[in-house]
A protein has these predicted regions:
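Phosphate/diphosphate ligand-binding glycine-rich loop within oxidoreductases
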Residues: 66-117
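N-terminal glycine-/charge-rich "phosphate-binding" loop or analogous flexible N-terminal tail
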Residues: 1-67
């Protein structure tokens, strides 16, 4: 982990898709990080090891992401627009239940955005 509390795998591999975990609760850091080797040579991962609900911070952290792992925050229509229309995100993976309460599924489907749980 560096001074900015970010765990990042294979940052030099810009040929690989980038998965971003923009926020996480402390108790989930180690379990997630323990599985990062499974994605070696498949995807780069950038995990921010803190929790915030600040929209601007979340958008800044995900600006280069192709996929976002969502833990504990809602993807409002404005965030969905910023990440998919103006950004590069093509997949949201949710770490919990009730995904339909966290993202507008019809809009995501209409845009061809993959939503996983």
């Amino acid at each position: 982990m560096n001074e900015r509390n970010i765990i990042e795998t294979q940052p030099e591999r810009t040929d690989l898709p980038l998965i971003v975990i923009p926020v996480i609760v402390e108790s989930m850091i180690e379990p997630f990080a323990a599985n990062f080797p499974l994605l070696h040579d498949i995807a780069r991962i950038r995990m921010h090891c803190d929790f915030t609900l600040d929209t601007d911070t979340i958008l800044e952290r995900t600006k280069d992401a192709e996929a976002v792992i969502v833990i504990g925050f809602h993807i409002t229509d404005d965030i969905l627009d910023a990440m998919t229309v103006r950004g590069h995100v093509s997949c949201f993976a949710f770490g919990g239940t009730g995904v339909a309460s966290y993202i507008n599924l019809p809009v995501a489907r209409e845009r061809g955005i993959r939503v996983c749980n």
